[in-house]
């Protein structure tokens, strides 16, 4: 039996903020955020449109939740460095 995969994902919001979450299905979870049914943070209209800018797969729920916790407790500068180190073009995001 194949074990379930878990993911963290990062959304870039229209107000220039980041939202990090945890899921076992990134596509479905992103859709819930886009339709204002996700986390309270992403239900705010001024944060839309949202862009899915990063996701990472984990073998265990514990590892994914730990990574989400770690990301959420970083400073803005540390989050930006993490995203840049993982190939996210923040300058391009801000221009669009």
Swiss-Prot record:
InterPro entries: GIY-YIG_endonuc, GIY-YIG_endonuc_sf, UPF0213_domain. Residues 4-81 form the GIY-YIG domain. Disulfide bonds: none annotated. SUPFAM superfamilies: GIY-YIG endonuclease. Pfam families: GIY-YIG. It comes from the Bacteria. Belongs to the UPF0213 family. This is UPF0213 protein Lreu_0682. It comes from Limosilactobacillus reuteri (strain DSM 20016) (Lactobacillus reuteri).
